[in-house]
């Protein structure tokens, strides 16, 4: 998690809290937020380096809708933000996040979704896996477009397919080799024996490219790769308070240049949403996948994304919210990731790894139906010492005020 995400986590938590109440009254909302955060280690430097702490002020405008029109549903959330660094003025930047689409269905058996996601933000510093440790402004632009279709074969069985396009670009020339694009197609069957259980199997094929992987005399040499997976998926609503969902995949990745990042084996994820009491909500997640996939998990969200250049990342997270009173909510989160790193240029067989732990604590106060105040504290620490990853630790704390109208 980078320092930008520390800041935006404050806003994300409050927005997720405010939207359900607004949706009950109106399909539209407008909002604004102002937050100030102190970050102890902006550049994620290793211990012993000069201090690079800063105070960051973030102003955000928000808008969204969730509107049904007959059988169709339009949805969208958008934010525009301005980030003002007090000391590191060269890092001042503007960004945005977008998540929009339409759920559609016909009178007969056809239904599906069209969606677009986009995010523009300051890229994380010192991401590891041999990435350059720069201290200048580096803007990361990520985009995703997805179309899915479902056709009901019989009452319990449906045929489902999807097509997804992704791309990522950086403004800093030092990160040319990390620009990439990927197209993915998936086709499979889903069985729903009851409203509480669904099971699926699908084939998934991805074709991607790092177009500026390595500079050569007449330009750049590209690294093309393919990935083939068989996905087993399932969702079980155990009760009104507990929902489990998971994916188990068996696949293989092959690259034309960076063969050190090739892998063959199992990936997947499992998540558990549990509400043991009316006041407590716990979300847990366990995941193992390639950096190409984990980088896009949060695209379009207010909090931005966290790019991952690893061969394989295994992570576990637990996030909890407790309603202390009708107006006050306490939040806590713990995330742990273990990355398998390799020399992405494939020049040699250098292999390494690192481990990152992130802890967050916060609170929110709903002053009234439209105003929220909140504060949050974060601790971020990475261990691992090699040519591919260096250790660091960083703390951040801040508060915000948010106004939402409908």
Predicted regions and their residues:
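Cleavable N-terminal export/targeting peptides
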Residues: 1-27, 406
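Gram-negative and organellar
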Residues: 23-406
């Amino acid at each position: 998690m980078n320092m930008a995400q520390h800041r935006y986590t404050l806003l994300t938590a409050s927005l997720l809290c405010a939207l359900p109440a607004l949706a009950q009254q109106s399909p539209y909302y407008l909002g604004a937020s102002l937050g100030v955060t102190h970050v102890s280690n902006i550049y994620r430097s290793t211990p012993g380096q000069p201090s690079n702490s800063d105070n960051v002020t973030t102003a955000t405008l928000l808008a969204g809708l969730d509107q049904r029109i007959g059988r169709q549903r339009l949805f969208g959330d958008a934010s525009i933000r301005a980030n003002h660094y007090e000391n590191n003025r060269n890092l001042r930047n503007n960004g945005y996040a977008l998540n929009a689409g339409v759920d559609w269905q016909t009178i007969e058996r056809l239904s599906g979704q069209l969606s677009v996601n986009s995010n523009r933000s300051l890229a994380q510093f010192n991401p590891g896996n041999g990435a350059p440790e720069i201290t200048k402004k580096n803007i990361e632009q990520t985009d995703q477009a997805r179309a899915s279709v479902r056709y009901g074969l019989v009452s319990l069985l449906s045929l489902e397919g999807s097509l997804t396009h992704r791309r990522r670009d950086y403004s800093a020339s030092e990160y040319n080799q990390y620009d990439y694009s990927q197209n993915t197609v998936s086709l499979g069957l889903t069985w729903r024996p009851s409203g509480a259980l669904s099971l699926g199997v699908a084939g998934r094929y991805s074709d991607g490219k790092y177009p500026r992987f390595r500079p050569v005399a007449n330009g750049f040499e590209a690294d093309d790769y393919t990935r083939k997976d068989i996905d087993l998926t399932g969702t079980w609503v155990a009760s009104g308070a507990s929902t489990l969902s998971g994916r188990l995949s068996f696949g293989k990745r092959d690259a034309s240049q960076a063969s050190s990042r090739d892998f063959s084996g199992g990936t997947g994820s499992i998540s558990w949403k549990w509400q043991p009491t009316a006041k407590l909500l716990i979300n847990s997640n366990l995941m193992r996948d390639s950096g190409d996939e984990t980088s896009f998990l949060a695209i379009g969200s207010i909090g931005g994304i966290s790019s991952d250049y690893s061969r394989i990342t295994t992570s576990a997270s637990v996030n909890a919210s407790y309603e202390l009173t009708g107006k006050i909510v306490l939040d806590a989160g713990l995330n742990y990731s273990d990355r398998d790193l390799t020399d992405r240029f494939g020049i040699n067989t250098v292999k390494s790894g690192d481990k990152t732990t992130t802890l967050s604590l916060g609170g929110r106060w709903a002053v009234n139906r439209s105003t929220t105040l909140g504060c949050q504290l974060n601790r971020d620490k990475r261990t691992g010492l090699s040519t591919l990853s260096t250790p660091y630790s960083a703390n951040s704390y801040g508060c915000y005020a948010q106004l939402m109208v409908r």
